[in-house]
């Protein structure tokens, strides 16, 4: 604990708010995810760090929920993998991994339209995260892998991103996917990122995606539509056109900010649905594809725990910070009365402020 009384006061208040949230989320609304086959899942958590401890397991739902209520962690995780010995320290071999959920992690960075500090969030970078989820789903998961919205679980991470779980309704397909090893998962994500794109033998899906982009950039596509050997065709073009083609290809391949480690790591932890994100205080919230597609889900509105927007504090914010809008209310370093929802964001971002009496 910090020796600074003001800092201790803030930490204690934040801890109390997290406790209030979990009391409501668990006892009243049943929001908190209970990982499937709980005894075979590893649990991790963080308070002042993203992950303070892991290698924890529980035999029953009751034990797990009692522990969450007691600890009320700022960050809460479960393993994607199912393990024989989830509480053992070590890699997949020691833990006895026998299957694994497959999930994508889209984590966007500050965009060209953002005017804030790199660590902040706004409608622009959150909008970019939404767009990337739709690209992943509509350009790849639906057409290439025959999945439907019923086969996906989409989760707002509580920050600038989303987790997209593959949960096919077909039990045989689900079983097959969850048995994928590291190599299969790596091939899967590298295909989507275009890392194994072969310009001398273009597959139909990537071909269609790129031709669509070529047309937007006024690049003649007739010969690309007829041929699979694009490398030879590109090399016949003028230098300026050739450069434009390669730049377009690179731009399309870099559209998605996918965290490859989430797909690659055998013992990866992912945020627990129904918890709060310790850096923002926003909810880790499952949403529907239709609410994302129609732009009905607004992270800076629907991601805020409503009760925390009604608890007010008088504060002195001691450093200049970018504005943030939560539930339609905008706050910045000049704000002197703020809701708990904004207080959690300030705390999570290490902003220097004090709570006044």
UniProtKB/Swiss-Prot annotation:
It comes from the Archaea. Its cofactor is Mg(2+); Mn(2+). GO terms for cellular component: DNA-directed RNA polymerase complex; primosome complex. GO terms for biological process: DNA replication, synthesis of primer. It is an enzyme of class 2 (transferase). GO terms for molecular function: DNA-directed RNA polymerase activity; metal ion binding. Keywords: DNA replication, DNA-directed RNA polymerase, Magnesium, Manganese, Metal-binding, Nucleotidyltransferase, Primosome, Transcription, Transferase. Transmembrane segments: none annotated. Its EC number is 2.7.7.-. InterPro entries: DNA_primase_S (IPR002755), DNA_primase_ssu_euk/arc (IPR014052), DNA_primase_ssu_PriS (IPR023639). The active site is at 105, 107, 259. Catalytic subunit of DNA primase, an RNA polymerase that catalyzes the synthesis of short RNA molecules used as primers for DNA polymerase during DNA replication. The small subunit contains the primase catalytic core and has DNA synthesis activity on its own. Binding to the large subunit stabilizes and modulates the activity, increasing the rate of DNA synthesis while decreasing the length of the DNA fragments, and conferring RNA synthesis capability. The DNA polymerase activity may enable DNA primase to also catalyze primer extension after primer synthesis. May also play a role in DNA repair. Belongs to the eukaryotic-type primase small subunit family. Heterodimer of a small subunit (PriS) and a large subunit (PriL). This is DNA primase small subunit PriS. The lineage of its organism: Archaea, Methanobacteriati, Methanobacteriota, Methanomada group, Methanococci.
């Amino acid at each position: 604990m910090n020796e600074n009384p003001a800092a201790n006061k803030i930490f204690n208040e934040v801890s109390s708010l997290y406790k209030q949230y979990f009391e409501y989320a668990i006892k009243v609304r049943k929001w908190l995810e209970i990982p499937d086959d709980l005894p075979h899942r590893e649990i991790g958590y963080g308070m002042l760090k993203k992950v303070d401890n892991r290698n924890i397991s529980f035999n029953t739902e009751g034990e797990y929920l009692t522990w969450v209520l007691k600890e009320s962690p700022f960050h809460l995780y479960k393993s994607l993998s199912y393990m024989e010995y989830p509480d053992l320290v070590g890699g997949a071999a020691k833990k006895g991994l026998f299957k694994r959920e497959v999930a994508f992690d889209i984590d966007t960075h500050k965009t060209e339209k953002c005017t804030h500090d790199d660590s902040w969030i706004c409608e622009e970078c959150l909008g970019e995260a939404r767009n990337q989820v739709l690209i992943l789903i509509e350009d790849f998961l639906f057409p290439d892998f025959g999945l439907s919205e019923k086969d996906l679980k989409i989760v707002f991470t509580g920050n600038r991103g989303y987790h997209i779980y593959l949960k096919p309704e077909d039990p045989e397909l689900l079983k097959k996917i969850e048995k994928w090893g590291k190599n299969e998962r790596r091939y899967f994500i590298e295909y989507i990122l275009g890392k194994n794109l072969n310009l001398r033998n273009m597959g139909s899906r990537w071909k269609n995606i790129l031709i669509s982009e070529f047309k937007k950039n006024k690049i003649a596509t007739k010969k690309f539509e007829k041929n699979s050997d694009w490398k030879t065709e590109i090399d016949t073009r003028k230098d300026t056109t050739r450069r434009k083609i390669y730049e377009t290809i690179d731009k399309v391949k870099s559209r998605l900010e996918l965290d490859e480690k989430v797909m690659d790591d055998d013992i990866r932890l992912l945020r627990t649905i129904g918890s709060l994100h310790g850096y923002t205080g926003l909810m880790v919230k499952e949403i529907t594809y239709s609410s994302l597609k129609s732009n009905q889900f607004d992270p800076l509105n629907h991601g805020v725990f409503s009760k925390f927007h009604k608890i007010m504090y008088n504060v002195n914010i001691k450093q200049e910070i970018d504005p943030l809008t939560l539930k339609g209310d905008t706050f910045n370093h000049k704000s002197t009365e703020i809701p708990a929802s904004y207080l959690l964001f300030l705390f999570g971002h290490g902003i220097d402020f004090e709570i006044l009496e």
